[in-house]
UniProtKB/Swiss-Prot annotation:
Placement of TPR repeats on the sequence: 398-431, 432-465, 466-499, 500-533, 534-567, 602-635, 636-669
Stretches with biased composition (Basic and acidic residues): 15-24
Protein species of origin: Caenorhabditis elegans
Enzyme Commission no: 2.4.1.109
Protein name: Protein O-mannosyl-transferase F38B6.6
Membrane topology qualifier: Multi-pass membrane protein
InterPro entries named among the record's database cross-references: O-mannosyl-transferase_TMTC, TMTC_DUF1736, TPR-like_helical_dom_sf, TPR_rpt
Amino acid sequence: MKKHLHHKVSGSCDPGDRSPKEKGRSQGIRNLLILISLSIIPYLSCLGGDFVFDDAESIVNNPIVNGKDPLLQIFSRDFWGRSISSSNSHKSYRPVTTFTFWLNYKLHETSTLGYHVVNIICHTVATLVFYKLGKQLEHIFDFFNIAFSASILFAVHPVHTEAVANITGRAELLMTIFSLAALILHVKNREINCKFVLLVILSTLSKEQGLMTIPIAICIDFLAHRSCRSNFVRMICLLVAIGFLRMMVNGFEAAKFTKLDNPTAFLNSKFYRMINYTYIWLYHAYLLVIPVNLCFDYSMGCISSITTMWDLRALSPVLIFTIVIIGVKFQNECRAFTLSSLMGIISFLPASNIFFTVGFSIAERVLYLPSAGFCLLCAIIFKKLSVHFKNADVLSITLILLLISKTYRRSGEWKTELSLYSSGLSVCPTNAKIHYNLGKVLGDNGLTKDAEKNYWNAIKLDPSYEQALNNLGNLLEKSGDSKTAESLLARAVTLRPSFAVAWMNLGISQMNLKKYYEAEKSLKNSLLIRPNSAHCLFNLGVLYQRTNRDEMAMSAWKNATRIDPSHSQSWTNLFVVLDHLSQCSQVIDLSYQALSSVPNESRVHMQIGSCHAKHSNFTAAENHIKSAIDLNPTSVLFHANLGILYQRMSRHKEAESQYRIVLALDSKNIVAKQNLQKLEEHNCYNSTLP
């Protein structure tokens, strides 16, 4: 009988033999990789996108970000770079976010890829931090297996697109990261410590909603039955202290918004104002539940105001009351459900118009932090329902894939202003502001007729839209329709007498209609409002020149260059008139000052070169005219003038070469033909001499 030999095996390849700790670590790594992937993939379509919507104001034209003003002034400026104490300030104080823009600008300047990469990284970090908080809450409330599914939903939810794909939305991302990190710290330590306070401050200095971290922490303590009176008092004191300091930064003043920003806030009836607010709250909730028709701007007719009880939307308070009653009923059954609801509601409070008026009616970006509570809520509901549905996993995967697809498409729409505004028009065709924005983009791209059509639509939807009146008037003026332009611009300044740009544009239209008295009055009205407008002074100078007041024209242009040394049109016109008045010595005297400000302005070089030639400084003249040609190689005038200069210097071959370039650019140029003929006759005469 054969004996069977059994060999001892020192290890096993069976994954089932792994310890629970190893399994947990492996699953944790898998979950993290899935969340990182899902946070990045939907937003790949926005990489390399332009600066769109309010990016120009918060980044490109922000003097702190672009380095025109010292970085230390970040603490005295609002989010848009204006002085926080100014009456025109938006009163949004977010120095942490602005500092990250400053760093981006230092590294990438106006190349947008780096900005978008940072935003996507921030969204990924926010998702991972949310996952960490969710795992902690699972243990506190004994309600397991919700953190991962909630975090997946958070990673791919389409309502986050504005916060992630729009670079300016970084304020929401940073605020949420610091807020959730503070909550993680609080859940772990229970007591208030320096790290928690620092994270709350960083969150608040990223965006004002961050202050709501403290009430959320209080709710966690209360629902987890671990609150004590002393800790509660410290929390309230911290909330009051940070809130007081934040209001002190604003000088205890609220931002001043217009009816265009938030129409509901300007309703005369407090009753209907409250009804409209409740509808707006429900609409935000609707965007979380059904994120299908997303829009970058919901103002100006997109959501019409409720002004009668016959409007079904007037039932919004009843619906909210019903939801609250249902929530109260479930609070004892599931504390995690209650916390999720409170987390969403509390973090939304700063945008609710309850405590102060905000500068929008509906905004998707403000839902970034509140959506964390919503995602937890969805995970809890899904877990409860999955018990009763066999194919719950298939349905959830299908839903996630649909959300990824929607987010990917939506983030692609944020890539350019044209695609963004076009998508907005399909959702809110009655929004005058979208028509206005689309008109502006089309006009900037040279599509004048399409731009005019959108401006007319904006004015039709809102006849008092003075900015649309101004832009359309300006566009029509450029196309030669000064009469219609004058009519539109006159309406704009009637609607807003302090509209300096419209007064200036009205003056230009009146000047082109030869209404010089009215034009001068309009331009001076503009300067009364904005005395340091170099462009308005330039146009006033043009008016003086047309009415044969050369000295006053030169004075206006000199003032323009004093205010803005880089105003090239003023330098050019000033030099032309000085040359015309035989004052070339002044042109030469001012040339260094001009070229130090506008070194790459071809017309300035040309005029300086012309004056040097008149003073027989041929070498200097040649250098400046050549510089002008280098900057504008296709200018017939520049090549012709260089040919004339060479002819005066008896450098006939070089003169002939310049005239032939002129004729190649403009075959009918009479001056070049005549001068070339003279050169040929001269050469022929010289060749016949003995």
